[in-house]
Amino acid sequence: MKITSAIAFLTVAATVCAEELPRKAKGPRESYPNADVIYDSVTAPDGKRLRAIITKPHETKAKLPVIFLTGWLSCDSVEAPADTKDTIGLILRGLAQTPGFCLFKIDKPGCGDSEGDCSQTDFNTELAGYRAAFRALKNYEFIDSSQIYIFGSSNGGGFASLVPETDAEQAQVRGYITIGGWVKTWFEHMLDIERRRFALMKKAPGEVTDSIKGATTLYYEWLINGRSVSEILKEKPELADVWPEGKDQAHLYGRPLKFYQDLQKLNLAAAWSRVKVPALILHGQYDWIMGREDSELIAQYVNANAPGSARFVEVPEMGHGGQHYLSMADAFAGKQAPFDPKIIRTMTDWLEQQQRKPAG
């Protein structure tokens, strides 16, 4: 890093977090031949420090637009070292090397170097961290915080439009990209994914319906009535077979039960209906986790508010997180084909197209 870049880094670090966040990861940091990487931190409202990883093109002199990541549900880090084999990591590395753009990522509490415990963090706490990071963008002298593109992956593709709270913050956003997002209630999503899961498990059609009846009771009591899964299963032990986590009745997909009760209280349809900027809404042909209809609805809601602003794209042979599969059965089994980098080009072409348009 050159002296001028080092001075800029120290200035930014002082404005965002007064004390350097210790590194927990044992692997190499991110690095790129054509981009600088800054490891910083943002302090969330509850006082926990969250790792921020920012990339910017070498020799940047003017302020640049920024791609701001709203991440997935799982407790996986956003860090994407050069040797990553993770598909979303490969996509993020592609975005980090896009000429003319910065990339801003944070690790949620307890992920990567961030303080906290991901397995005990509810969604409202996680969202507050993203909002703090969004507001910190103005502290970086190389970022044009009036030109923010929010990229939401999976769960982040659902709640992306909740990050900018005020009218002024919404005016800072130039566009959205989502991959495998959602917009229905979480209760509806759980019934959708369970129906697909049971079918892909090769249950007979009648068995799928019986299992969905049980899942409907279980998820209604948990998500809508606010009861614990252990309490429900103690009362109705016959529902135990439909609970995806087996004996762990306090977590789902590594997150606490309250995380999903928070999601159930959201109104994402209302949030996306307020969006007035361009949106690229992507869904994989072989995404069995998030349904195609959710992504179509996001595009529909944006277009109802700003006709022609949103574009829905069904990406052939793509899975939930950008993976390349040859069939839905392969996607369910996790049997990946070699990564197809065309998804990166789809995103960067769209970003460059938006930048050629006049702001506002």
What kind of region is each of these model predictions?
Residues W288-D294:
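Conserved alpha/beta-hydrolase "acid-adjacent" motif
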Residues M318-G321, L326-G360:
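Catalytic active-site module of serine/aspartate enzymes centered on a nucleophile-bearing elbow/loop
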Residues E59-L95:
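Short, surface-exposed "cap/lid" segments of acyl-processing enzymes
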Residues G89-D113:
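Conserved alpha/beta-hydrolase
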Residues V275, I281-H283, D287:
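Short beta-strand/loop motif that positions the catalytic acidic residue
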Residues L21-A62:
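N-terminal cap/lid segment of alpha/beta-hydrolase-fold proteins
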Residues I177-S273:
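Accessory cap/linker subdomain of secreted extracellular hydrolases
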Residues Q120-Y140:
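Alpha/beta-hydrolase active-site loop
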